[in-house]
Amino acid sequence: MNKKEFSLERKTYLKKIKQKKYLVLLTQLLILVLFLALWEFLANQEIIDSFITSQPSRIWKTLTNLTSNDLLKHIWVTTYETLIGFLLGTFLGIIIAIVLWWSDFLSKVSEPFLVVLNSLPKVSLGPIIIIWVGAGTPAIIVMAVAISLVVTILENLNGFIKTDKELIKMANTFKASKFQILTKIIIPANLSTFINSLKVNIGLSLVGVISGEFLVSKAGLGYLIVYGGQVFKLDLVMTSVIILGVVAGLMYASVLLLEKFILHTKKFK
């Protein structure tokens, strides 16, 4: 096969991949539109109770009303708390994972505690955290960190331990220090592990923030959901849930962009 034929086949292959991506996106949008149309139709025909389930037109009306009544403030509060909790949970989790990888003794001592903490429902710690930290933003951020921290430690530590043993043996043969093994082998080999941690943590941090806002906040999307439920404004609840889904999707998309950037940078190094 000559170079021209190979280039043509590659272009055809890439074109098919692009077409498949567009087809997937189009199908997703079509499903969403059909779902919303069916929801609106069933509510208008009173087949479902719009007071309980709301409907797209009422949600849109609620959204436009919220836009003129501090909606951006509520979105910003939840986003800010999530980002702080996400960054702290990820950073502390990776640092602790490195410390545990460095010290086999500490790793074995902490293992049962980490397993117990991981299986413990973190939301149940909410009242304790509020008493310790106080009601307000700090308590919400601590809850976000508490939910994401242990998962980050376990996932990264597992990645460090499973790093190619032959590479580490070779480095030891050349009398590399533990720090050199960490920076030259462990960390570069676990970029995908770090990225996976980010993907998981953005969702976990948001869960922690919303749980905290349910308990103590007077602003944020979690607060809007609780308030809407208390005064039986189901339109407000559904609108807040949808906005929350959009915020979560945008945050996850940001992590995917970061992943592409890191992999692209690594590829051309």
Model features per residue range: what roles?
Residues 131-132, 160, 207-243, 267-269:
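Glycine-rich helix-loop "coupling/hinge" segments at transmembrane-helix boundaries
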Residues 104, 137-201:
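Membrane-cytosol interface at the C-terminal ends of specific transmembrane alpha-helices
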Residues 73-81, 123, 131-152, 236-241:
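Loop-to-helix entry region at the N-terminal start of transmembrane alpha-helices
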Residues 104, 238-269:
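C-terminal transmembrane helix and the adjacent membrane-cytosol boundary/short C-terminal tail
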Residues 13-17, 45-87:
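Periplasmic/extracellular loop-to-transmembrane helix junction in inner-membrane transport proteins
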Residues 12-43:
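N-terminal signal-anchor/first transmembrane alpha helix
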Residues 38, 113-120, 131-132, 142-156, ...:
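Hydrophobic transmembrane alpha-helices
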Residues 84-114:
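Transmembrane-helix boundary motif in ABC transporter permease subunits
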